[in-house]
UniProtKB/Swiss-Prot annotation:
UniProtKB keywords: Secreted, Signal
Leader sequence segment: 1-18
UniProt lineage: Eukaryota, Metazoa, Ecdysozoa, Arthropoda, Hexapoda
Listed GO CC annotations: extracellular region
Highest taxon of source: Eukaryota
Name of the featured protein: Cuticle protein 1
Organism per entry: Lonomia obliqua
Subcellular location: Secreted
């Protein structure tokens, strides 16, 4: 059996060496060309991968730039709206203050007019009106309840005695 195993081993080696020249072999030039083609293909594949990565990075930068620009525009719009709302609120406050000033000036003018007209009418009407005048009629004689009597120059309507003029010590000469 040993002989058979050794014989088969020698026969295998011998037949391989005898068949090798007859087997189709690769030419050295063809092998070199195939290696060059494989190297070029690998380089092309690597270049394509790098270009793909570069395009992906460029797209990401472009997206981030656009997103940043949109956020900046939105912030600018918000700040502009807030600014103009502040301007409008300020103008409304100024207009309200001017309206209050005009109302105060109108009330002062009414008091002044009532005071000036009441100086000639009220001293003569008051003694005759006496107890016949109710508390609400005084506002008809002197608008807004003011006038010469309301200012305390001649007297004022008394809430305690409900008479005109008031002679209460706290209101005299006020």
């Amino acid at each position: 059996m040993r002989f058979l195993i050794a014989f088969v081993a020698i026969l295998g080696y011998a037949s391989a060496s005898a068949i090798y020249p007859l087997a189709y072999g690769v030419n050295a030039g063809d092998a070199q060309a195939a290696a060059i083609d494989a190297a070029v293909a690998a380089q092309d594949h690597a270049r394509a991968a790098n270009e793909g990565q570069a395009r992906a990075v460029e797209a990401a930068v472009q997206y981030n730039t656009d997103a940043t620009r949109q956020v900046a525009e939105a912030n600018r719009d918000l700040h502009e709206t807030a600014y103009w709302n502040g301007v409008a609120a300020t103008q409304n406050a100024v207009a309200a203050a001017q309206s209050q000033v005009a109302a105060a000036n109108g009330a002062a003018a009414a008091v002044r007019a009532a005071h000036e007209s009441g100086a000639y009418v009220t001293p003569y009407v008051a003694p005759y009106a006496g107890s016949y005048v109710n508390p609400y009629a005084a506002s008809l004689v002197t608008p807004y309840g003011y006038g010469i009597n309301g200012l305390g120059a001649v007297g004022s309507w008394c809430l305690r005695s409900r008479r005109l003029p008031c002679r209460c010590p706290r209101l005299v000469n006020t």
